[in-house]
UniProtKB/Swiss-Prot annotation:
It comes from Halocynthia roretzi. Changing residue 133 to C/A: Abolishes catalytic activity. GO terms for cellular component: membrane; nucleus. Responsible for the deiodination of T4 (3,5,3',5'-tetraiodothyronine) into T3 (3,5,3'-triiodothyronine). Can also produce 3,3'-diiodothyronine from reverse T3 (rT3, 3,3',5'-triiodothyronine). Does not have significant inner-ring deiodination activity for T4, T3 or rT3. This is Thyroxine 5'-deiodinase. Inhibited by gold thioglucose (GTG) and iodoacetate (IAc). The active site is at residue 133. It catalyses: 3,3',5-triiodo-L-thyronine + iodide + A + H(+) = L-thyroxine + AH2.
Length: 259
């Protein structure tokens, strides 16, 4: 068994490789686009309406692969912050004890903990994100469908965390959701209210504290998913935005339900 330090080092090195891979692909796509314009070549083929990119554009107005903020030095910094920093700090690991981090119940406005939403013998499926994160908002319809399909056998929780693309720090061009960084908890609750009005879902809803305890415990920035069963982490999803995969989440939930 690896000790905690070894696990964090391995995770850090894996995330560095992933970060460089993403950065290389982003730079390559940008160079290809510039080359096509320079050569006067035809633009790319029409976008498939069912594709992830098309869903994000339709839901939020943002084209991540063409957004200047994603290709800027600030973009590199924030990607490194979420991929390298937040994920290395997380204590939630598959097979380990689920961190019982602090939250505030959106409906009651009372302090609570994440495991308060867990019931014995039933998986708790957690979805972390914020309004300003395009993949999170664009995919929420899929998450709602998963809730509808499995709510009789599992419980679901959405946790609102810090803004992934706040308007004052790392704004995305044409983003439908222009929300500044949360300075006070009231700011975060107001952002959560915007989210609640923007999407339709039937599950528990909680808001992270201003200490970002849940965000840090689960490496949730910019968005992430997790499945908890009887206090153990059964699944921890990939780092958003590129590895935020609700299809994978559903497959993992089916596997947990078969246990």
């Amino acid at each position: 068994m690896h000790n905690l330090l070894e696990i964090k080092i391995i995770r850090f090195l894996r995330n560095v490789f992933y970060f460089l891979h993403v950065l290389f692909n982003e730079c390559l796509d940008t160079l290809k686009a510039y080359y096509k314009r320079w050569r006067g070549m035809k633009s790319e083929k029409p976008l498939d309406p069912s594709s992830r990119r098309a869903r994000i554009i339709q839901a939020t107005g943002v084209d991540l692969s063409r957004d200047p903020a994603m290709q800027s030095l600030r973009g590199v910094y924030h990607m490194a912050k979420s991929i390298l920093y937040a994920d290395v700090l997380r204590t939630a690991v598959r097979g380990g004890n689920a961190p019982n981090s602090s939250l505030v119940n959106y409906r009651t406005k009372e302090k609570c903990n994440i495991l308060d939403f867990m019931k014995p013998g039933r998986p708790l499926v957690v979805n972390f994100g914020s309004c300003s994160u395009p993949p999170f908002m664009a995919s929420f319809e899929i998450f709602s469908r998963i809730i509808d399909s499995y709510h009789e056998r599992a419980d679901f929780l959405t946790v609102y965390i810090e803004e992934a693309h706040s308007s004052d720090l790392w704004a995305l061009k044409n983003n439908k959701y222009s929300i500044p960084s949360h300075i006070t908890f009231e700011d975060r609750m107001e952002a959560a209210a915007i989210f609640k009005k923007s999407v339709s879902f039937e599950c528990a809803f909680a808001v992270d504290t201003m200490k970002d305890e849940t965000n840090l415990s689960y490496g949730a920035l910019p968005e992430r998913t997790a499945i908890i069963l009887d206090g153990k982490v059964q699944y921890i999803g990939g780092i958003g935005p590129f590895n935020y995969d609700l299809v994978e989440l559903e497959k993992e939930l089916i596997a947990v339900l078969k246990k």
